[in-house]
Amino acid sequence: MARFVLWGTYCDGALQKREPFRDEHLAGLRALKEQGTLITLGPTEGSTHVFAIFESDSKASVCALLEQDVYWRKGIWTQLDVYPWVQAF
């Protein structure tokens, strides 16, 4: 399995706009964490960006998971960039 990092952006006013979708979003993340696919995920201070580490077979599978997330579908996340990652330490 390879590791991938996500670097993305939130829409303006994300803290308020995400509220109706937050429970669904967190449930999906919890399931990915339990499966071992999601290592960690969270916003930067001020909630302008999102960072995550995934473990998966391919970048395409990580992108597919992210595109299913309600935050992406509802425009809370506005850009998602996924990169292969080599952990040095």
Q: Which positions does each model-derived feature cover?
A:
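Conserved, structured core segments of small domains
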Residues: 1-89
